[in-house]
């Protein structure tokens, strides 16, 4: 990889002309979102996340490797470095960090006025909206 975010690369003006993207956002009640995050983290642990990270560490991966900096991996490196976190503590830290990441994403997209927000349970409404607004090139 280049180490640079995609947004740092120039986009020719000819590509931007006539582009009006259709942006759809999915929104949930905060309590529901947080409960889903908690369930997802529990499932990740049930499916062997701790063993996966342990094997990666044994294979020589470190917290400096890009793939190990993501939520769900870096917390294990913190546990090893600090030595004071338990597996339960790591799990709670992953939940907290995921909730914070979700909040940042929501904040980012809320500042984009062209986002059309829907509840994920309204799939028929979303499909109709897309069909009514999709322009085939």
Please place each PLM-identified region on the residue numbering:
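Phosphate/pyrophosphate-binding catalytic cores of soluble transferases and nucleic-acid-acting enzymes
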Residues: 1-137
């Amino acid at each position: 990889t280049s180490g640079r975010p995609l947004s740092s690369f120039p986009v020719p003006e000819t590509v931007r002309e006539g582009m009006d993207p259709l942006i759809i956002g999915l929104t949930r009640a905060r309590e529901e979102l947080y409960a889903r995050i908690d369930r997802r983290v529990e499932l990740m642990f049930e499916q062997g996340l701790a063993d996966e990270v342990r094997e990666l560490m044994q294979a020589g991966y470190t917290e400096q490797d890009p793939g190990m900096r993501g939520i769900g991996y870096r917390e294990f490196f913190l546990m090893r470095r600090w030595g004071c976190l338990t597996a339960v503590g790591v799990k709670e830290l992953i939940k907290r960090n995921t909730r914070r990441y979700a909040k940042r994403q929501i904040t980012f997209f809320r500042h984009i006025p062209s986002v059309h927000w829907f509840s994920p349970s309204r799939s028929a409404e979303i499909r109709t909206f897309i069909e009514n607004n999709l322009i085939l090139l």
